């Protein structure tokens, strides 16, 4: 059983959490940077990434706009992204294998 399953987090929230973290790392952004771009507090981003928050459609739209991706991309279980920054690529390879 994964940490998400133990916490009762749905698969959609798990996908969203991982996708936001993946997109954020691929751009070399901190949680603070993403939060500022969306008009959120850093702890809100942290809670989304840990799967603790249900995200409203309005907030999902703000996150998608910050990443310049369609909302559907945030919920897409395909995690293949082109990573340009070596440090981000190393982290993602280590974290997601």
Q: Residues of each region from the PLM?
A:
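Recognition helix of helix-turn-helix/homeodomain-like DNA-binding domains
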Residues: 39-55, 79
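A short, Lys/Arg-rich alpha-helix, primarily the initiator
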Residues: 2-26
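Conserved hydrophobic/aromatic packing and binding residues within compact polymer-binding modules
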Residues: 20, 34-35, 45-48, 74
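Short basic helix-loop element that most often maps to the first helix and adjoining turn
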Residues: 18-37, 62, 89, 95-97
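Short, charged recognition helix plus adjacent turn
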Residues: 1-10, 75-97
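DNA major-groove recognition helix of helix-turn-helix/homeodomain DNA-binding modules
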Residues: 58-73
